[in-house]
């Protein structure tokens, strides 16, 4: 799913880049300075490529919530941790103890491999489910949406 999102974002960025060239050509024909315009559009395309590709779709988040509720909530209901209460799933806690920092990839690694009392889930969940639950946990933590 994320690969499809990446393709969509790349297509949008390519269209933005093409539009920038068209606008720049038209402005240049009128003798206008096109450097600031071209630069601004390039920055916009870059932002689309870096932020849009990492965002999860509503369907991905719904699957992530379903996987979380069916597999993770026994220990992590509402973002808590019933085994080690200090290691919640809020952003500040995840920033402290995730190997690799607070990012989806670090959550994926921990879900796949486990750590401490947390078991590895790579043999029980599909790659799609792990990706979705990692994006869900990341989004919940980023938005401070866990309900304690």
Curated annotation (Swiss-Prot):
Pfam families: Cytochrome_CBB3
Modification after translation, per record: Binds 1 heme c group covalently per subunit.
GO (cellular component) term, any one: chloroplast thylakoid lumen
Gene Ontology biological process terms in this record: photosynthesis
Subcellular location: Plastid, Chloroplast thylakoid lumen
UniProtKB keywords: Chloroplast, Electron transport, Heme, Iron, Metal-binding, Photosynthesis, Plastid, Thylakoid, Transit peptide, Transport
Residue numbers binding heme c: 72, 75-76, 118
PROSITE patterns from the UniProt entry: CYTC
Transit peptide stretch: 1-58
TM segment ranges: none
GO molecular function terms attached to this record: electron transfer activity; heme binding; iron ion binding
InterPro entries: Cyt_c-like_dom (IPR009056), Cyt_c-like_dom_sf (IPR036909), Cyt_C6 (IPR023655), Cyt_C_IC (IPR008168)
Induction profile: Induced in copper-deficient medium.
Subunit structure, interactors included: Thought to function as a monomer, however 2 crystal forms are observed; a homodimer and homotrimer, suggesting the protein oligomerizes.
HAMAP family xrefs: Cytc_PetJ (MF_00594)
Protein role: Functions as an electron carrier between membrane-bound cytochrome b6-f and photosystem I in oxygenic photosynthesis.
Similarity section: Belongs to the cytochrome c family. PetJ subfamily.
Protein name, per record: Cytochrome c6, chloroplastic
Organism encoding this protein: Chlamydomonas reinhardtii
